[in-house]
Amino acid sequence: MKNDTLNDVINSIKNASRLGKREIIAEPAAKLIGKVLKVMQDYNYIKSFEVIDESRGGKFKIVLNTTINNCGVIKPRFPVKNENLEKYEARYLPAEDFGILILTTTKGVMSNIEARKLGIGGKLLAYVY
């Protein structure tokens, strides 16, 4: 039984990137994982992803870029106000304007950059740089 499927997918991406693999198969194909992958694709951390198995659980086929230095899931999922985003950026990202935090908000899953532009906070899910 898998307890944290987002963590499994993020770790699969990190391990495959370190080994130099170009694509991976990750499961299950949950909506939240798909939205996190979409944010990573928008910032060119992955080239593409698609659902390849529509059966129970499903699977993602993820094509990687070579730009991922590190990525991980943030646990526990801290609720963050817009004013406090900078504190968590300093904690999880190595430098200013290098990498993204992925958070879930009332407007959907987005990066810290988009959340700052909209002036909203949310719960931290992951970091990528």
UniProtKB/Swiss-Prot annotation:
Organism for this UniProt entry: Thermoplasma acidophilum (strain ATCC 25905 / DSM 1728 / JCM 9062 / NBRC 15155 / AMRC-C165)
Protein family: Belongs to the universal ribosomal protein uS8 family.
| Matching Pfam families | Ribosomal_S8
Looking at the keywords, is Ribonucleoprotein present? yes
The free-text function statement in the UniProt record for this protein reads:
One of the primary rRNA binding proteins, it binds directly to 16S rRNA central domain where it helps coordinate assembly of the platform of the 30S subunit.
Keywords, A to Z, come to: Ribonucleoprotein, Ribosomal protein, RNA-binding, rRNA-binding
At the top level, the lineage of the source is Archaea
Q: What is the name of this protein?
A: Small ribosomal subunit protein uS8
Q: InterPro entries recorded for this chain?
A: Ribosomal_uS8, Ribosomal_uS8_CS, Ribosomal_uS8_sf
| UniProt keyword Glycoprotein present | no
State how it assembles: Part of the 30S ribosomal subunit.
Q: Which GO terms describe its cellular component?
A: ribonucleoprotein complex; ribosome
SUPFAM superfamilies per record:
Ribosomal protein S8
Any GO BP: translation
Q: Which GO terms describe its molecular function?
A: rRNA binding; structural constituent of ribosome
What NCBIfam families does the database record attribute to this sequence?
A: PRK04034.1
